Structures are given as C-alpha cells and as structure tokens.
Curated annotation (Swiss-Prot):
InterPro entries: Flag_assembly_chemotaxis_eff. One of its GO terms (biological process) is protein transport. Belongs to the FliJ family. Keywords: Bacterial flagellum biogenesis, Bacterial flagellum protein export, Cell membrane, Chemotaxis, Membrane, Protein transport, Transport. This is Flagellar FliJ protein. One of its GO terms (cellular component) is plasma membrane. It is a peripheral membrane protein. Its main location: membrane. It is found in: Cell membrane. The gene is fliJ. It comes from the Bacteria. Transmembrane segments: none annotated. Flagellar protein that affects chemotactic events. It comes from Caulobacter vibrioides (strain NA1000 / CB15N) (Caulobacter crescentus).
C-alpha cells in the first residue's frame, strides 16, 4: 500500500472514530434528558398525591404545576435538539464511513495494479531469459 493511501485511511479512521464518539455523547445527552423528563413526571405525580390529603397544598400546587410544565417543555425542547443533532451526526458518520471505504477500495486497487505490473515485469524477464538461452544454444 502506498504512503498516501495509508495516510488517507488513517485520517479517515480517525474521523470515523471522532464522529462515533460525538454521536455517543449526543445520544447520552438525549437519554439523560429523557430520564429527567421521566423523573420530573414521577415527581409531579408524587406531589399531586401528597397534595390530595392537604387542603392548603392547593395554593402551592398551582405554581408547582406551572413550573413543572415549563421544566418539562424545556426538557422536551432539549430532547428535540438532541434528536436533530443526532440525525446530523449520523449523516456525518455515514459520509465519513463511505469515504473511508472509498479510500480502502482505491488502496486495494492500487495494490492489485502494482501486483499486476510486477507479474508482467517478471514475465517479461522470464521471456527475455528464455530468448537468451535459446539464442545461446538451449542451455
């Protein structure tokens, strides 16, 4: 394999690995946000159950529900942003992987071409050797 092909493949591998790490981080952030929404919903449900038994809790529950709705909406926006970022990262990773495969294919073709040239050169040398032997007298 030629130096330039090895360098391209190494750089492409690095790019693919970097994009895989980025995608993993984005997915982790999205999952954490989804977990926070789940916890927020569970917390709101627990507060509602606690407020059922206390008549004075009705006043603070109004504010609590509004705050909970806002936090939930913020988390849902964050999840949506993560999903969009994740889709972009997946596309970039797919493109980088395609480029890597192209470079590997070009390197393989260059290797095959070099082997064909070497075989043709060896065949020409053997032909020349047999012609010389025939000219000398068949030794």
């Amino acid at each position: 394999m030629t130096k330039w092909a090895a360098s391209l493949i190494r750089i492409s591998n690095h790019e693919v690995e970097t994009l895989q790490k980025r995608l993993a981080e984005i997915t982790e952030r999205r999952m954490a946000a989804e977990m926070r929404v789940t916890l927020l919903d569970a917390e709101a449900e627990a507060e509602a159950k606690n407020a059922e038994g206390d008549p004075s809790a009705g006043w603070y529950m109004i504010g609590y529900r509004e705050g909970s709705k806002r936090r939930r909406a913020d988390m849902l926006v964050q999840i949506e942003q993560c999903q969009q970022e994740e889709a972009g990262a997946r596309d970039a990773l797919s493109e980088a992987f395609e480029n890597l495969k192209k470079y590997e294919h070009v390197a393989e073709q260059a290797k095959i071409l070099a082997a064909k040239k070497m075989n043709a050169f060896e065949a020409a040398q053997m032909d020349e050797l047999s012609i010389r032997r025939a000219a000398v007298g068949g030794r």
